[in-house]
Amino acid sequence: MDLALLRTFVTVHRAGSFTRAAALLGLSQPAVTSQIRTLERQLGRPLFLRQARGVTPTTIGDELAHRAAPHLDALVEIAESGLDDDSSSRTLYLAGPPEFTTERVLPALTGLTGDDGQGLTLRVSFGTAEETLEGLSCGRHDLAISTTRPRGALLSATPLCDEEHVLVAAPRWAERIGADTVRLKGAPALDDLPVVEVHESLPFVSRYWASVFDCAPAATGTVIVPDLRAVLSCASAGAGLAVLPRYLCARALEQGAVVTLLDPVVPPLRTYFLVVRTGTLALPHVARAHEWLRHAATAWC
């Protein structure tokens, strides 16, 4: 059986689409379709059911993928191991949310770039979870940081760390509300405070309210700015309350620029995932960065 046909088959199985598999393989869609049909003729069985959007593997397709994929990944690892001495000089294409990537991920990965300029080179893109996972699926990125665990066989996700969300405001707002008022009265104590958020839907505030107060926020956004660092700056300047990751506002809390309005027994958490295309950890530079970040993240929690 032709290994090239098996490689195409496994890629289609993971991608769930001839179009996406063609992009990952650097082939035309007709070429991918032709290779799958050739393999199906050789086996005498259909491997995929064609759907309106993508393809679904048949039982024999799932069985073949289960048997073939680990061996193909091992062959890739063997082939790439010859590049191991040079893998430090290869380029890693990384994508993730701007704040977490800037504050946590990039400082950690600089340890792989090398003092002599001969280490790993980085190319970084920022985007939403949907954008970064789509880019990873299409082959634009090697590694993605996401707060959404991807579905399907194409992408493999590893939990990286949990970030704690904190309800903060400038000290004058805390003084205006009064000590322990939020703890005693709950969400209504905050109804008249302006809100600083990253989006009109108030994703951070809504998640916090649902988790801690078991209700939706009554207020709308007073300042909407699509960057958590800008949200912190606005909150520090007195623009209103905000819900922020603790790692991002820790220094501002230490300096007294903002204060916590409530310290719940169980604070809201959000999980970050380290995501790769299934099988690409056989590539030394991807595996090295993946392991490096997993180790670094043990100090982030």
UniProtKB/Swiss-Prot annotation:
GO function term, MF aspect, one = DNA-binding transcription factor activity
Task: Kindly indicate which segments of the sequence are annotated as binding DNA.
Answer: 18-37
Matching entries from InterPro entries are given as: LysR_subst-bd, Tscrpt_reg_HTH_LysR, WH-like_DNA-bd_sf, WH_DNA-bd_sf
- Keyword annotations: DNA-binding, Transcription, Transcription regulation
Q: Does the keyword Transcription apply?
A: yes
Q: Pfam families, alphabetically?
A: HTH_1 (PF00126), LysR_substrate (PF03466)
Q: Is the Hydrolase keyword given for this protein?
A: no
Q: Where is the HTH lysR-type domain?
A: 1-58
Record's SUPFAM superfamilies?
Periplasmic binding protein-like II, Winged helix' DNA-binding domain
- Which PANTHER family does the entry link to? HTH-TYPE TRANSCRIPTIONAL REGULATOR, HTH-TYPE TRANSCRIPTIONAL REGULATOR CYSL
The record's family statement is: Belongs to the LysR transcriptional regulatory family.
Role noted for this protein: Putative regulator that may be involved in stimulating antibiotic production in S.antibioticus.
Q: Could you identify this protein by its name?
A: HTH-type transcriptional regulator AbaB
Name its species: Streptomyces antibioticus
Gene, per the UniProt record:
abaB
